[in-house]
UniProtKB/Swiss-Prot annotation:
GO CC term, one of those recorded: DNA-directed RNA polymerase complex
Annotated gene: rpoZ
Function in brief: Promotes RNA polymerase assembly. Latches the N- and C-terminal regions of the beta' subunit thereby facilitating its interaction with the beta and alpha subunits.
Upper classification of the organism: Bacteria, Pseudomonadati, Pseudomonadota, Gammaproteobacteria, Alteromonadales
Disulfide bonds: none
GO molecular function: DNA binding; DNA-directed RNA polymerase activity
InterPro entries: DNA-dir_RNA_pol_omega, Pol_omega/Rpo6/RPB6, RPB6/omega-like_sf
This protein's name: DNA-directed RNA polymerase subunit omega
Assigned keywords, A-Z: DNA-directed RNA polymerase, Nucleotidyltransferase, Transcription, Transferase
Organism: Shewanella frigidimarina (strain NCIMB 400)
Name of one Pfam family that matches: RNA_pol_Rpb6
Catalytic activity: RNA(n) + a ribonucleoside 5'-triphosphate = RNA(n+1) + diphosphate
SUPFAM superfamilies xrefs: RPB6/omega subunit-like
EC number: 2.7.7.6
Amino acid sequence: MARVTVEDAVNKIGNRFDMILVAARRARQIAVQGKEPMVDEMNDKPTVVALREIELGLVTSNTLDADERQTVREREAAEIAAVAAIAEGRVL
C-alpha cells in the first residue's frame, strides 16, 4: 500500500488547517453518509481515501459545498413532495 503524503494534499488545498477540515468532511461523507469514493479504496480507511482524493484534486472545499447544497435541495424537494401528497390526501 502506498503511503499518502499529507504534504501533497496540503499543497492542493493551500494550508494544513483547511486540508484537515476538507479531509474530515469528505471522510465523514464516505463513512457515515455512504457516498461513493472517487478513487479505489484499496482497503484504506475513509480518512486515507479522502486524502488521496484531495491529493488528486478530486475534492476541494468548493466541491464539498456544492455537493452539500445539492443534497439539501434534494432533501427539501422530497419533503415538499411528501407534504403535497399529504395535503392532497386530506383534500380528497
